[in-house]
């Protein structure tokens, strides 16, 4: 398999899979069941989800281990180790025929008297390294607490390891712990042990696209994995708005805005990743003006104001207010 650093130098975006929990919860009788335990109890279902994403066109899959941090935080190292063991085995077996990369998926660790965040992350890194995993995604982070220690520990044990750190920011750029994405990105870029940095979860593709357009990434390799959209509750089920086609279009725009690594978070399914793969396979669109050689319209040009025309003409106007957030 091509070294991941070599792959990224080709300029081709690395497309990750989407949400494991969303797909697992949609299976009959699985709503409310912890999907990480599925690696132990229902391995055939977890493997089927991995393969569905690979068939959709992703080039990297995450191990089914997002909440292992919680097991370690409450002192249940045995369950954590069993989940990591089974999840690594499943992800590797599924990814190998497709030539896809396998990333250790590490979710946010809670603050705990029993186990500080830094130690939690380092213990997880050891579990994955001991099983031959060399690619790591630390995702949905509300802060960078413990990040420096993890990055240094990881590279001390395995210098060739590849580490992506990804923060969860709302559309205004803040995390739930009050940190700002730009600050977290800047501090992460300053750590030479971190290979890529970015954002995932909380926000839909439109808002993450608009957010990264205003960022100074400092030349970092940028990773962006938005939610499918924003959740609503329909018949006791959480449903995310946004079609796979729309998601794919926005992922392509996110790549054009500078991201090298993309994928999906909450609410995304193999259909969303297929939409992204299809959109990324298309050549960049060329505007009609550019293709015809016509001069672009001056920025100062004035277009017709249909609202003003209706008001001036005494016609009735209907105003509609949409509840934020929208995507």
Q: What are the residue ranges of the model-derived segments?
A:
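Domain-level signal for soluble alpha/beta catalytic cores
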Residues: 1-327
